[in-house]
Amino acid sequence: MSKDIKFNFLNSDEEERYQKHLTLKEIGYEGQINLKNSSVLCIGAGGLGSSVLLYLAAAGIGRIGIVDNDQVEKSNLQRQIIHETNTIGNLKIDSAKERIKKLNPNCEILTLSLIHI
């Protein structure tokens, strides 16, 4: 999704996925479109960031950026719920991206590791 593209509809998968949001007067169809057109940057995919990222993706944010410079360690797994045992040793940004895409394939994920700069 390019930042210049604005969506004005939900596809059938999104309508089913966000059915509860669509029935809420506080969100509704227009609100869900606004979420789809929104971008969020999360600095850190650790303790707090790991939970926030999952909720943002589940809510329907269209584009999420993740910045982190750390690798997944076994000791992270009890509190950083976005990461899994099979991602130990991977960059947290890659682990988080993989998990978010499983949760919501409609969400665009952009990553930046400060290690590579």
Regions found by a protein language model. Give the residues of each.
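Adenine nucleotide-associated cytosolic modules
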Residues: 1-115
